[in-house]
């Protein structure tokens, strides 16, 4: 078994990468992992439906943090997927027998340590496996305060669940890690990449244009008496559910990015980044206030 130290975090993928890199000798906070990967985003995707309503996302797609950190830090990650579930579990066992710590992409629905009310069919939940005892795998799930255990059958189901974003048993781990990071170079580059994502995306439902588009839709629904009574509460409830219940949410990701800007302001001695961190925190506050007021409207 490795000497891995569990860390709770705000979001699964950024938390996993923070823990993996720190464990392998490159200390990195979760906000820094999130910020360097340029993962902040917004998307209102009309052609992907959940219960007849458009998919809303507040960050870049799954695996974007893992891949983004490779670009920003020089870390080389090894990725493995499997057609056969048994072979995928055997490969995991072989890594653990070598004392390796690995990240997995899983389905929340099949993880038995999740309370029943928190389980849903979401196939992009990231966690770390750092050992095993008998039939149990020792899990560092970033969203939990303490390490967890998961039996082999359940973990196999979680890794090989079918459907959207199916992981196909995805297992990943660092192969090459630099001794340090040139923050003065990579922080500004990552911020510029994120600005481009939010302000210059070619599609009208991505970034700031996507946020405005959603706002315009809400105003249009509010002006239509029939839609205001029936569809608007459903849409508001959907937005809040996507924002606050599924994953870290709109406000949560803004708070993480604000923490990245604050940490960066200290590393680079930048008053502008400190000011930007305050503005981003305020943006998160507004998203949370919106969710609160929308919830009250849904309840009447």
Task: Annotate each language-model stretch with its function.
Residues 1-28, 38-179:
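Conserved active-site-adjacent core of cysteine acyl-enzyme catalytic domains
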Residues 6-7, 119, 240-247:
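Short, charged/polar micro-motifs that form catalytic or ligand-binding hotspots
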Residues 22-31, 261-268:
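Short helix-capping/linker segments at secondary-structure and domain boundaries
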Residues 23, 72, 95, 158, ...:
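Residues that form generic nucleotide/phosphate-binding pockets
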Residues 134-246:
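Noncatalytic regulatory segments and standalone regulatory/sensor domains
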Residues 241-300:
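Charged, long alpha-helical assembly modules
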